[in-house]
A protein has these predicted regions:
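Positively charged n-region of N-terminal signal peptides that target proteins for export
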Residues: 1-6
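Bacterial N-terminal signal peptides
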Residues: 7-16
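Long, low-complexity intrinsically disordered regions enriched in Ser/Thr/Asp/Glu with frequent Gly/Pro
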Residues: 18-20
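N-terminal soluble domains immediately following signal/targeting peptides that reside
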Residues: 22-157
Length: 157
């Protein structure tokens, strides 16, 4: 679990240091980060309240629904069954509103994958629960990607 928290913090830090060119502040975007390290896979999702506020009259209610949906990680993403990944740990944290970030949700999961070389992408399912046009992604160490509903994958290359 300590590995999950450490890598999650590092990935959030990296996303904040290097937003994609022409993109808004990462605190205003839904983000997903994934890192493969040997047979371990770490996935982190950040959902700021500002990313959903314009899409509903009650952003806190929408965040409550999203947080409940994330109890099953497959609501947010899925993994190729051939990789043989099993969930080792997961955390979903509701962030309190602060002037610099505005609050939201931070979620992270750690998997052990029997055949991690078979894992070429993380399939993103978030578009079905969050009405957004894109997600900022980071596949570590490959780099940043913008993920759209018509090609909802965070690709490892």
């Amino acid at each position: 679990m300590n590995i999950l928290k450490s890598v999650t913090l590092i990935m959030v830090f990296l996303l904040n240091l290097a937003p994609a060119a022409g993109q808004v502040n990462p605190f205003e975007r839904v983000t997903i980060s994934a890192a493969k390290a040997g047979q371990n896979l770490l996935v982190n999702i950040g959902i700021p309240v500002s990313a959903v506020a314009a899409r509903t009259d009650n952003p806190e209610e929408l965040l409550d629904a999203i947080q409940s949906a994330l109890d099953d990680y497959r609501t947010a993403f899925s993994l190729d069954e051939a990789a043989g990944c099993r969930l080792e740990a997961g955390d979903i944290i509701r962030l309190s509103s602060k002037p610099d970030t505005g609050g939201g949700i931070s979620a992270g999961w750690e998997f052990f994958c029997e055949n991690s070389q078979s894992l070429s992408a993380v399939d993103i399912n978030l578009f079905s629960i969050i009405p957004i046009s894109s997600i900022e992604g980071l596949a570590f160490p490959e780099g940043q990607q913008v993920i759209y509903p018509d090609l909802p994958k965070l690709v490892f290359e």
